[in-house]
């Protein structure tokens, strides 16, 4: 998914799900993925997030409307259920030119 902030492409998000969640192919994914999973009785129990600095590839730069090799914040989220089974992995690339993060 390509997410916009104030009309500017700002976050490139890629979600990876196990095959058993193929029902998502028939869902409207413009809203919250967590809401869709919850509607199917699936809840996230454990979550782990990593943060790295990355440089935009040609494809990523084109989608985010920035120069190739521009710095990006790369977040990876690992979500699992109460038994530790993987639900999904999320990769988010943030265009830092449009954002300020408050911690």
List each language-model region with its residue ranges:
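C-terminal all-alpha effector/ligand-binding and dimerization domain
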Residues: 1-103
């Amino acid at each position: 998914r390509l997410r916009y902030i104030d009309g500017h492409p700002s976050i490139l998000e890629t979600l990876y799900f196990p095959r058993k969640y193929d029902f998502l192919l028939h869902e409207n994914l413009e809203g919250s993925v967590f809401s869709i999973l919850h509607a199917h009785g699936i809840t996230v129990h454990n979550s782990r997030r990593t943060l790295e600095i990355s440089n935009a590839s040609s494809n990523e730069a084109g989608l985010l409307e920035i120069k190739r090799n521009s710095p990006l914040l790369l977040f990876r989220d690992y979500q699992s259920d109460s038994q530790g089974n993987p639900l999904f992995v999320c990769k988010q690339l943030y265009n830092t030119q449009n954002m300020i993060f408050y911690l």
